[in-house]
A protein has these predicted regions:
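N-terminal transmembrane alpha-helices
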Residues: 12, 16-36, 44, 57-68, ...
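Helix-loop-helix hairpins in multi-pass membrane proteins, especially solute transporters
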Residues: 60, 67-204, 231
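Juxtamembrane non-transmembrane "cap" segments at the membrane-aqueous interface
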Residues: 420-441
Length: 500
């Protein structure tokens, strides 16, 4: 058996949890502010939108490399080592972004940020499941959900105000010291709460994972702009797909896999993971399409659009701990069913958007939609990991975070592609029906605006169908029979069983 870390009852969970939440909040905040800053960064470095978008793309690609190996890292290194490394690296990356004199330097900063953030999220989830007993995990994950949801809610609005008042550099100058303070607090407050071993790193698996996930993520991020039949995009999908097939095959053969695919033998985990992936894709429809609608159709600035979407994010943050308490008492099934029912109705309501839809309609529908999402997201995630038990939790955390990352990338590319293709088709149809001449700029602009809205409506209809599919699957959720206690509640930690 490997080294067993501290498992005493004397360890206080509150200070550890508080430091973890602070780290999660600042990292989630960082993820949502970059898109608001892109126009000003383009001006500062005199670069194109395609070049500036690499600040988002490189962060996603780095996450795609780091997140799949987090299960190995959590088994190999202690809680303190990993958290201090991830927060320290994140703080350094943020400071580099703040002082960046050129685009290449800020790009390097984003890579370093992503390395820290990619480790941070799976690590925090694993620690929460370790220090809290099963009957309190729902509430604990709900509190974690406050950071996950509230930071993205205020991020765009806060960043928009900072950038308009000061500069995009200031945004990073504020985030960096907060991350540093959390790093310093972790030195004194974060204890080792999990078990460590000395597993052998599957180097070939890491290479295949990097090529596979990196190829697919980059393919989806560029397919919407270059076209899905572009030779580069097709090559990325082929190379990425073949690499992932080889990666899965190898992970089923090696003794210490990077991602443990045999956890899909657990029925509830598999079911909730499928629902999680579907809901993540559906959620990204609103995250990507609503800002486009508010800015391109109503002429809002990013800051104004952020204010419109702010209530929905706040509702998600407020509801997270409440939903966690309800999950601890009633389980995930009916929370998922109710949440998905609300999501279906409100997503369908967004298929009725027009060029003159009132602001109040958009705010209310989007906010209620986020309320529905808040009821189901954390319960299905927690229920799936509970089904695995603590011994396999790190594998489940790495797997779900990896699949959600892929689902987010696919969702963004998928819905933007639907909006674009359907929008162009609607514009042509409107021009033919109204007999609009391409030289009539006023009528052409009106047709483009109307066609774009119709394309957005079509994309939300697909999101509605996805929500219906998840709703049907939710009826098959059962309550996990596992009652495994957190190691800190035990006198000893059991050895991790090997899946066969």
């Amino acid at each position: 058996m490997g080294n067993t870390e501290t498992t005493s009852r004397s360890i206080r969970t509150t200070p550890i949890f508080a430091v973890l939440l602070a780290g999660a909040f600042v990292a989630f905040l960082n993820q949502t502010v970059i898109n608001v800053a892109l126009p000003r960064i383009m001006e500062s470095f005199d670069i194109s939108a395609a070049t500036a978008n690499w600040l988002s793309t490189i962060f996603m690609l780095t996450n795609g490399i780091v997140i799949p190996v987090t299960a190995f890292l959590m088994e190999r290194y202690t809680t303190r080592q990993l958290f201090l490394f991830s927060m320290g690296v994140f703080a350094i990356g943020t400071f580099i972004c703040a002082i960046a004199p050129s685009f290449s330097i800020i790009l390097i900063g984003r890579v370093i940020q992503a390395i820290g953030a990619g480790i941070l999220f799976p690590l925090i989830t694993n620690v929460i499941f370790t220090i809290f007993p099963i009957e309190r995990r729902g509430f604990a994950m709900g509190i974690f959900g406050v950071a996950m949801n509230f930071a993205p809610a205020i991020g765009p609005t806060w960043a928009g105000w900072i950038i308009e008042t000061y500069s995009w550099h200031t945004m990073f100058y504020i985030i960096a010291p907060v991350a540093l303070i959390d790093f310093l607090a972790a030195i004194f407050l974060v204890k080792n709460v999990t078990e460590t071993r000395r597993p052998k790193l599957d180097v070939l698996g890491v290479i295949l994972s990097t090529i596979g996930f990196g190829g697919l993520l980059y393919g989806f991020s560029t397919g919407g702009t270059k076209g899905w039949t572009d030779p580069e995009v097709v090559t990325l999908f082929i190379v990425g797909g073949v690499s992932l097939i080889l990666f899965v095959w190898r992970q089923l053969k090696v003794g210490h896999p990077i991602l443990e695919f045999r956890i899909f033998k657990y029925r509830l985990f598999t079911l909730t993971t499928i629902i999680n992936v579907i809901v993540t894709m559906a959620m990204f429809s609103g995250m990507i399409l609503m800002p486009i609608y508010m800015q391109n159709i109503h002429g809002f600035t990013p800051l104004q659009a952020g204010f419109v979407l702010l209530p929905g994010g706040i509702v998600m943050g407020v509801m997270s701990p409440i939903t966690g308490k309800l999950f601890d008492r009633y389980g995930a099934k009916w929370l998922a069913i109710i949440g998905l029912a609300i999501t279906i109705v409100t997503t369908f309501a967004l298929t009725k958007l027009q060029t003159n839809t009132s602001y109040s309609y958009v705010i209310w529908v989007y906010t209620i939609r986020m309320f529905g999402m808040s009821i189901l997201m954390m319960p299905i995630f927690t229920a799936g990991l509970n089904d695995l038990g603590l011994s396999l939790n790190r594998y489940g955390t790495a797997m779900v975070n990896t699949l959600r990352m892929v689902a987010g990338a696919v969702g963004m590319a998928f819905f933007v592609s639907i909006m674009t293709n359907q929008g162009e088709a609607h514009v042509k149809s409107i021009m033919n029906q109204e007999q609009i001449s391409p030289t009539d700029k006023a009528q052409l602009a009106l047709a483009i605006k109307q066609g774009t809205v119709m394309g957005i409506d079509d994309a939300f209809m697909i999101a509605t169908y996805l929500s219906i599919a998840a709703f049907i699957l939710a009826f098959f959720i059962r309550k996990s029979g596992k009652k495994e206690e957190a190691p800190m509640q035990k006198k000893a930690v059991k050895k991790v069983p090997q899946l066969q």
